[in-house]
């Protein structure tokens, strides 16, 4: 976000979530609400209901009004939700696109990318890749994109192998 603010020619930042899509719902609806079911997924580092460091973005979204951020965080602690209002949600959507992918989507994405590009990705990167593809299909935006992938597919070997070779590939392991 800050690089974009300083002039890096970035059209959209894309927030990709797994089935615990609290951030997708927040960006699209303007309400951060943790009163929802929590799911354990194949992308466990994304298994969250309370996003760390979101308040840094909110600080910019709220014109650096720290008192407003403190109120929102207090509302989150006491009522498990807060709303940023239409104007701030529109600001968020002017900068960000958001989407989510469930475990099946991720497995399909791992297999697709492996088959088409001979690249083996982890489950977290599959979330990002799938959401980017969904964004491109719905928006028509074909801007060159960078996905920041920080996990090894071998750390999630069973899920990645199942995605590429099928359920029987891990039977008995």
Predicted features and spans:
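PLP-dependent amino-acid enzyme catalytic core
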Residues: 1-173
């Amino acid at each position: 976000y800050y690089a974009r603010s300083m002039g890096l020619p970035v059209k959209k930042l894309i927030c990709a979530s797994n089935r615990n899509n609290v951030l997708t719902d927040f960006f699209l609806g303007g309400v951060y609400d943790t009163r929802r079911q929590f799911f354990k997924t194949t992308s466990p580092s994304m298994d969250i209901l309370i996003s760390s460091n979101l308040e840094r973005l909110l600080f910019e979204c709220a014109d650096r009004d720290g008192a407003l951020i403190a109120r929102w965080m207090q509302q989150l602690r006491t009522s498990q939700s807060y709303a940023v209002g239409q104007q701030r949600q529109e600001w968020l959507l002017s900068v960000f696109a958001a989407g989510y992918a469930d475990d099946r989507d991720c497995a399909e994405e791992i297999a697709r990318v492996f088959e088409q590009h001979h690249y083996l990705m982890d489950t977290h990167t599959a979330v990002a890749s799938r959401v980017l593809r969904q964004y491109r299909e719905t928006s028509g935006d074909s801007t060159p994109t960078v996905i920041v992938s920080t996990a090894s597919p071998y750390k999630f070997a069973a899920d990645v192998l199942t995605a590429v070779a099928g359920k029987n590939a891990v039977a008995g392991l």
